[in-house]
Structure formats: structure tokens, C-alpha cells
Amino acid sequence: IKSGIEQNWSSDYKVMIEPGRAVVNNAGLILYTAGAIKEDRGDKPYILVDGGMSDNPRPALYGSEHKLFNISGNKKDEEKVFAVSGRHCESGDLLVEEANLPIDTNPGDILMSTSTGAYTFAMASNYNRVPKGKVIGISSTEVFDLVKRQSFEDTFAQDS
């Protein structure tokens, strides 16, 4: 690439590679805790989770889709369709419009959202003063902190 640029343009160019979705997207996931489940919301029940558009704004901004799995274990094989909504009381805070989850999904269950390794943390915010969650790394031999969980006080730390 570099020699091709130098042959066709000036040598003032600097070649950089941005890993992006193709390389790192599937390296990340987000864990949510299911809160209330609203059965009276039309054609499907809504699960409210302890995160939302502040930790993953991509669905609200441009409709990105993420698969969701209930990883709490000992669940029935039979599934039903749920909508999964965030905690921000915004009409756009819909993380997954149609998630096929076990019919016995309950408050307190852990839901795993996949393909969140690219841009998700970089786009996260403290919207509604919600602290950002912890980011961990997992290797073949250890689990380690990459970014520590914010406290509520951390969301005010830069205010004057």
C-alpha cells in the first residue's frame, strides 16, 4: 500500500489501519440484568434491563442489530419473542426489537448482547448520569480489568 501511494502521490502520506468492526466486533459483549417484564405492551412482552442507549447507542442511532441470549442457565428450550428496552425512558432506547428468549426468562436473569466490540464503548456516554460499566479482558489464562466501573460520583468529576 505504502509503495503504491508513494508512486502515485507525494510521500507526505501516513498509512494507518483502523481495525473496526471486521476485526473486533465479535470480540465484545455486554451483560445486562433483566428487570421488570411488561406483558401489557401490545404484541410482545418488554424486558427492561439495567443498561441501554448510554452503553450501546448503536441501535438507537442507526438501527444496528445485536443477538441476545439468556445465559442464566436451566432455562426451557421453548422460546418466545420479547422486545428488550433500556433504562432511559426514551422511545429510542430499544436495544433489541425482537429477541427470541426462553419463555421462562425472569427478572434477575443475565442477558448477553453479542457483537459489541467495535465502537460500542467509544460511543458510550453518561446520558441521564448513568455511570459506565466495567470493561474486562479475557485471555486463555486470566480475566482482567480494562476499564473500571464508574461510580455515580465519577459522572460529576469533570463538572465545575
Feature map (PLM): residue ranges:
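Alpha-helix-loop-beta-strand connector modules within alpha/beta enzyme cores
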Residues: 1-9
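Charged (often Lys/Glu-rich) extended helix/loop segments that serve as interaction or gating elements
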Residues: 11-160
